[in-house]
């Protein structure tokens, strides 16, 4: 008998929504509580970065690949990434089958960050993920780690479309300029992605 590496069983996709605009949403049963707790631990140890906009503080975040090794290679972070990658793999397989021109392409998950946005703050500038410094990016992925707040949608400019946050919701979309987007601010509680 093969034992599951996940306490409580593997995280699974419980609902998939493929929109006509190449944005896909995947609801999962991923418990994100310990990911938020891990972020808080990293923050308490002074390892988060505050991002600022012209209006002041925007959000705080941690780039997982930039953490000192003693904060990254422990049992908790391994468990978090095992589950994160498991959900990513399921969603990406489904996305690729939906858009079969992608079948046979190689995808690499090169960077992960956890981000906290406080009420009224956030990075509201329209942007897209494929930039001159990262032209290799083809698909962006995001997991909403919590809900329980008003606002906080991810808004896509040219699609006139918003994704509503829900804990465990995984989103995939193309990185090119046509999917210019922004994170709208949460209005009354912290938002974690």
Segments predicted by a language model, with ranges:
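Fe(II)/2-oxoglutarate oxygenase catalytic core
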Residues: 1-170, 178-193
